Amino acid sequence: MINYKKTDLNELDQIIRCRMEFIREDTGPQTPETEAAIQTQLQEYLKNHLNRDCFVFAAEEDEKIISIAFLLIQEKPANPRFPHGCTGNIMNVYTVPEKRRQGIAGNVIKQIMDFGKTQNLDFLKLKAAPMGYPLYKKLGFEDACSRCKEMEYKWELKND
């Protein structure tokens, strides 16, 4: 039987395992040094943020997490688009390969949607990978239309 829940620090190792599986699938294999650095950062990040401004929802079967999604809550100055000043960013939606296409990830996302409503979030946003796009559309997510184009700036990393 599948159990859906909001995780806590007792599941830290399983959360990190799923995050690393997601990263490997999404971006390919990493060097052992990069994997170790990511895992170390995740340990610290989750210890400081889990169930504060980062929530991890999961599906569990036989005490093993089989599907997971992160919700990052961001508080910012309000405007007409987000009058409560709080929005949610869904990320790292991942289901183990043998459990895909069974509605499990959809149920995990529904948990986040219900939770977000109780937190008075103005909206939830996510970046949809091609595999997840039809699911998010089915759940009611819409393509974001904005007069502003999303941009980013990256610093060059120097190897010391």
Regions found by a protein language model. Name each.
Residues A58, K64-I73, N89, Y94:
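Conserved beta-strand in the GNAT
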Residues K99-Q111:
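Conserved acetyl-CoA pyrophosphate-binding loop and the N-cap/start of the following alpha-helix
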Residues R81-P97, K149:
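Conserved acetyl-CoA binding element of GNAT-fold acetyltransferases
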Residues I23-Y45:
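Conserved GNAT-fold acetyl-CoA-binding loop/helix
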Residues E44-A58:
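A short helix-loop-beta-strand connector motif used in the catalytic cores of GNAT acetyltransferases and
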Residues N3-R17:
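A short beta-loop-alpha structural element at the N-terminal edge
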Residues I73-N79, K125-K127, M131, K137, ...:
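Conserved catalytic-core motifs of GNAT/GCN5-like acyltransferases
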Residues I109, G116-A128:
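Conserved GNAT acetyl-CoA-binding A-motif
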